[in-house]
Swiss-Prot record:
Protein name per the record: 3-hydroxyacyl-[acyl-carrier-protein] dehydratase FabZ
Positions of the catalytic residues: 54
One BP annotation, GO: fatty acid biosynthetic process
Organism: Shewanella sediminis (strain HAW-EB3)
CDD domains recorded: FabZ (cd01288)
InterPro entries (UniProt xref): FabA_FabZ, FabZ, HotDog_dom_sf
Molecular functions per Gene Ontology: (3R)-hydroxyacyl-[acyl-carrier-protein] dehydratase activity
Length: 153
């Protein structure tokens, strides 16, 4: 049994997701097992564009962007599970969210750790669970659905 980790750097992430700055919210994948789990990180800095207005006096990362980042992590797991890439003829779309809960704010200097698990996949629709932590402390948890759809050319 190998202890080698399956990692992804930013180049491979950009080959697997259609998102680009300022909406690419995953910096690195630390490990993944296709069809099972993915662990990724996002380094949050004061230079993030959303901090200009949310909130200038007390910068806090918007919860919807934490969920979007979690959805991007599930998209990476889906692409790796299906051995697909953004250059193929389909995209994974954020299709639904349930049981989203926030437990802690995210501030500049935090490093988000995403842990997503594939629950099931059927007919191009994937169901995932995810948690986000900072320094081991729970930030957010949710169930996310994403749907694979062909790109119309």
């Amino acid at each position: 049994m190998s202890n080698q980790l399956n990692t992804m750097d930013i180049k491979e992430i950009m080959n697997s997701l259609p998102h680009r700055y300022p909406f690419l919210l995953i910096d690195r994948v630390l490990d993944y097992t296709p069809g099972e789990t993915l662990h990724a990180i996002k380094n949050v800095t004061i230079n993030e564009p959303f901090f200009q207005g949310h909130f200038p006096i007390q910068p806090v990362m918007p919860g919807v962007l934490i969920l979007e980042a979690m959805a991007q992590a599930t998209g990476l797991l889906a692409y790796k599970t299906m051995e697909a890439a953004v250059t193929d003829d389909s995209l994974y779309y954020f299709a639904g969210i349930d049981k989203a809960r926030f437990k802690r704010v995210v501030e500049p200097g935090d490093q988000l750790h995403f842990e997503v698990k594939m629950v099931k996949e059927r007919r191009g629709i994937g169901v995932f669970t995810g948690v986000v932590k900072v320094d081991g402390e729970l930030v957010c948890s949710a169930e996310i659905m994403c749907a694979r759809r062909e790109i119309k050319k």
